[in-house]
Every structure is written in C-alpha cells, then in structure tokens.
C-alpha cells in the first residue's frame, strides 16, 4: 500500500546516513574530510562531496547564491566534472544563519530544479561538516520551490521534513 499525500500534508522521511565520497579530487589544504577543489572554465570551487544514496557536490556561497546564468553554467560544469564518474547533483548553498540555508539546485541530467530532497539533505549535512550548522538542530532549507527542514543526528542519520504539495496535475492514457 502506498500512502497518498495531498496538498500541504506534512511528511517526514528518514534517510540513510550521509556519507562522504572516497577521495577522487585534489583535497583542499586544511579542509575537512570530503572537501575537494574542483576547477571548471568558470573558476575553481572548494566543494563538499557527499552521498545521500546519490552523489552530491555542495558549493558553499557565503556571498550569496549564483544568478540563473551562473547556476546554469557552473551547475552544468560541476555536475559533469570528470571527478564524478556518473555525474553529481550540485547544490549552491548560502548560509543565511546557523539554522537557515538558501539553496539553488542543479540536478545531473535535469538542470535547474525547484527543489530536491536529497539535495536539501546534502546541503545541510555539508554545512554541519563545515561547522556552519549544528547537529540535532532543525535546519530550514529554502529552495525556489519551497521550504524543507533537515535534521542531522550525531550518527549522521538525516531526517527530511516538508509538505507534500501538488505541482501539477494531468492525465496519461495507458
């Protein structure tokens, strides 16, 4: 039986532990484990690489999120970077406060998206690893499509909470 969630039904999902990718790219000197320096035609970026069941490349943006044009250019270049064998989803993260993150997402194979649950989890986990956010504290993740809440436990288990919202409706002939 699959549960049906209608508009504004709160949902919670417990993900497996956030994991770090094995070493695959030049490490950033003095940086935390999982950090890497990835260079593209648009510049070099200090990133945090994580797995939330799928690969994520988290780019801290202390000065603000990239513009739509920068998101497209940088997101595509990082998602297809040779360091990622099968590509990676890319999250650009602007820490608004220790309990709030603004995030833009570039999904491998899809491009810019309004929201991404695993991306929100990766963004929060990366900011916890960087010491910007804290474990066991709800972290509000602001995405273009809405707000999700992520909590990282002491053992790196990730809990994602948010509303199930209808984005569109349609019919399919089978």
Positions of the model-derived regions?
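Active-site proximal loop and beta-alpha junction motif in alpha/beta enzyme cores
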Residues: 1-114, 124-174
């Amino acid at each position: 039986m699959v549960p049906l969630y209608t508009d504004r039904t709160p949902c919670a999902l417990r993900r497996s532990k956030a994991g770090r990718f094995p070493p695959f790219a030049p490490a950033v000197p003095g940086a935390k484990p999982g950090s890497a320096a990835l260079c593209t035609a648009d510049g070099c970026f200090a990133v945090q690489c994580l797995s939330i069941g799928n690969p994520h490349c988290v780019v801290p943006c202390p000065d603000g999120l990239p513009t739509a044009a920068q998101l497209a250019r940088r997101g595509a270049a990082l998602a297809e970077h040779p360091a990622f064998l099968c590509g990676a989803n890319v999250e650009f993260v602007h820490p608004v406060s220790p309990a709030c993150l603004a995030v833009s997402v570039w999904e491998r194979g899809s491009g810019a998206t309004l929201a991404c649950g695993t991306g929100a989890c990766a963004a929060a986990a990366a900011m916890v690893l960087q010491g910007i956010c804290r474990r066991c504290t709800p972290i509000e993740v602001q995405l273009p499509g809405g707000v999700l809440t992520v909590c990282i436990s002491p053992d790196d288990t990730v809990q994602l909470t948010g509303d199930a919202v209808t984005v569109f409706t349609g019919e399919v002939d089978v």
